[in-house]
Structures are given as structure tokens and as C-alpha cells.
């Protein structure tokens, strides 16, 4: 059972989604509808994009806790440029470039300057959040053009243009990681850094690429955020980094690097967003969201750690079982007699 869960984390995440969907349907029959599925998917798009980016970084055995601030900073740039009169394509392109540059800077700190990823991205978390607040003066950005909001309007099967773009992007990244040398380099770097170098993989560039892609995904998440709500608060992106990491771990991405898929991360993001629906349906106050998200992250990490320990014990047992042969009947009988004689001597 444990081996099945470990080897089929995507199926496990999908099963969790179905079970939660059925549970909510039992509480309220109106929840069992296609409209509910698309509504949850629409709410999950930001987290899905961040989970795709986090997957790239975590596969290389790193972590990025600055993506929430990167998302907020990119959303602010988008709003500032749109309100300054720039066209939507130009503003979106500049936003995407800013996200990639922010991710590239993180990658340089980690790969070239050899700063631990958690330390480097904690620093840039504050840096990017500070830049965001300096741009806005601590104020919200409002009055965004209708063209931006139109990106999140349903176009087909109740899913917006941004929603379809997110699905296509997820499938593309899943294919790149699973079927190309480009993707295999990420797995090799995270699984065995020295071994990957001996095979000719440019591990520093792979890690910088991972952080850069992560920054690009954060920029896309900022665009989606602005298009969905129509304004940009000064706390945009706060706490999203923890949810992105939780979604990845829930979907089977290892914190030790080298294993997991984008599809699993997407399913993990959908499941976490579904939990928010539970809070709404059960009329639980919104300020419980962070507590629930932290609890889920902690639970997933504990479960993942215990699962790996159990599997390692099983592997060791199987590895050395052939060296430990069971005692023959004569050996067992001799051992019993020896124990009986020892007991008599003690008596």
C-alpha cells in the first residue's frame, strides 16, 4: 500500500480531490455540478501557475520562498503600466520580463554565489515586497482597464482564456519534463548533483533556469490575480509561497529533489483550493484560511517523511533478506535446548 502511494502520488492526489468532492456533495447536493468544478479551477489558476514554477525549483533540490513577493511586485508593475496608458500586451510582456529577471537573480544567488536557497530567497522576499510598496506608496492600484478583466471571462465550457492557457502550459511543461533532455536535466540535478556534473549536465545553468522559470510563472500568476479581481492590493501575493510548496509536496514533489511531476503539483493546487471551498461551505471565517493551509502543509510534510522512512526500511529489508537465511529445524531445536540448559543452570 505504501509503495503504491509513493509510486502513484498523482493518483493519490486525484483520489483525495474526488473524496473531498463527494464529501462536499453530501453536505450540499448543489456542490455536485460542473459549474462547481470550473469555479474551483478558476480560483486555483494562480496557485497552479505558482506550483508549476515551484516544481521546477524543487526538482533541483532547492526552494523559493520569494514567489509571493514576486507575484505582488509583477502585479504592481502591470497595474502601474496600464494606468500609465501602455497597451495590455506591452504591460504583460514587461511584467513577464520582470518576473524572469527576479527569478534569474535568485538563481544567480544560489548557483553562482553558493548562498543556500532558503536564505537567498528569504532575502529577496523582503526585497521584492519592499520594491512593490515603494512603487505604490503603500496604496492600492485601482481603475484597471476592462480589457484586463476580460481575460478572466468564461469563453468555452465555463473556462476563461487564461484558464485554457494555464491548462496548455501545464501540459507543455509536463511533456518537457517527462520526454525531453531539457526536463531530464532537472531530475538529474536534483537527484545526484555530482553525478549529473560527471554526465556533462551544466547544473548551475539548470538551477538558474529553474529559478528563472519560477519567476516567469510568478509573473503570470500576478497577471491572473489582477485580471480576476480588477485591482491590486498592497498585500498581493502574501502567503502564496507556502501554498505553492504545499501543493507540490501534496502532489508528490520531493523536497529532496529529483522526483515528482507537474501534473501532481497541479492536482495538489486544485485540492488546496478545494479546501477553501470547504471553509466557505461550512461557513468558517476567512481568517482560518492561513491556519488550515499551514496545518495541511505540516500534515503533508509529516506524512511524506514517514512514508519515505517506511519505504526505505522495506527496501533495506528486501536488500539484505537474501543474506539472512531462516534457521533449519535442527538449528532451531539446538537453540531451544541451549536456552533450556541455560535456564536450568540459572535455577
UniProtKB/Swiss-Prot annotation:
It is found in: Cell inner membrane. It comes from the Bacteria. Keywords: Cell inner membrane, Cell membrane, Membrane, Transmembrane, Transmembrane helix, Transport. One of its GO terms (cellular component) is plasma membrane. GO terms for molecular function: transmembrane transporter activity. Its main location: membrane. It is a multi-pass membrane protein. The chain crosses the membrane at residues 14-34, 39-59, 72-92, 93-113, 115-135, 155-175, 213-233, 249-269, 284-304. CDD domains: TM_PBP1_transp_AraH_like (cd06579). The complex is composed of two ATP-binding proteins (LsrA), two transmembrane proteins (LsrC and LsrD) and a solute-binding protein (LsrB). Part of the ABC transporter complex LsrABCD involved in autoinducer 2 (AI-2) import. Probably responsible for the translocation of the substrate across the membrane. Belongs to the binding-protein-dependent transport system permease family. AraH/RbsC subfamily. This is Autoinducer 2 import system permease protein LsrC. It comes from Salmonella typhi.
Amino acid at each position: 500500500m505504501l509503495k503504491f502511494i509513493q509510486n502513484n502520488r498523482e493518483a493519490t492526489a486525484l483520489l483525495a480531490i474526488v473524496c473531498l468532492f463527494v464529501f462536499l456533495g453530501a453536505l450540499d447536493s448543489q456542490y455536485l455540478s460542473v459549474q462547481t468544478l470550473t469555479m474551483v479551477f478558476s480560483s486555483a489558476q494562480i496557485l497552479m501557475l505558482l506550483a508549476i514554477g515551484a516544481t521546477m525549483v524543487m526538482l533541483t533540490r532547492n526552494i523559493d520562498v520569494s514567489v509571493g513577493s514576486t507575484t505582488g511586485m509583477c502585479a504592481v508593475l502591470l497595474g502601474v503600466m496600464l494606468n500609465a496608458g501602455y497597451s495590455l500586451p506591452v504591460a504583460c510582456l514587461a511584467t513577464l520580463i520582470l518576473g524572469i529577471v527576479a527569478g534569474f537573480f535568485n538563481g544567480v544567488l544560489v548557483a553562482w554565489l553558493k548562498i543556500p536557497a532558503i536564505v537567498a530567497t528569504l532575502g529577496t522576499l523582503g526585497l521584492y515586497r519592499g520594491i512593490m510598496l515603494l512603487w505604490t506608496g503603500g496604496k492600492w492600484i485601482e481603475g484597471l482597464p476592462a480589457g484586463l478583466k476580460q481575460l478572466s471571462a468564461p469563453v468555452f465550457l465555463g473556462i476563461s482564456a487564461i484558464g485554457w492557457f494555464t491548462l496548455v502550459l501545464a501540459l507543455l511543461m509536463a511533456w518537457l519534463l517527462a520526454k525531453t533532455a531539457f526536463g531530464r536535466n532537472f531530475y538529474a540535478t536534483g537527484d545526484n548533483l555530482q553525478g549529473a556534473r560527471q554526465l556533462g549536465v551544466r547544473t548551475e545553468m539548470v538551477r538558474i533556469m529553474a529559478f528563472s522559470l519560477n519567476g516567469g510563472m510568478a509573473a503570470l500568476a500576478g497577471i491572473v490575480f489582477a485580471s480576476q479581481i480588477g485591482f491590486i492590493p498592497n498585500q498581493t501575493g502574501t502567503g502564496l509561497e507556502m501554498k505553492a510548496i504545499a501543493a507540490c509536496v501534496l502532489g508528490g514533489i520531493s523536497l529532496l529533489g529529483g522526483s515528482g511531476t507537474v501534473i501532481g503539483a497541479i492536482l495538489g493546487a486544485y485540492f488546496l483550493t478545494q479546501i477553501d471551498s470547504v471553509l466557505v461551505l461550512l461557513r468558517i471565517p476567512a481568517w482560518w484560511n492561513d491556519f488550515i493551509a499551514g496545518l495541511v502543509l505540516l500534515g503533508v510534510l509529516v506524512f511524506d517523511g514517514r512514508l519515505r522512512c517506511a519505504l526505505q526500511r522495506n527496501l533495506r529489508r528486501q536488500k539484505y533478506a537474501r543474506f539472512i537465511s531462516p534457521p533449519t529445524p535442527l538449528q532451531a531445536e539446538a537453540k531451544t535446548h541451549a536456552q533450556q540448559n541455560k535456564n536450568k543452570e540459572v535455577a
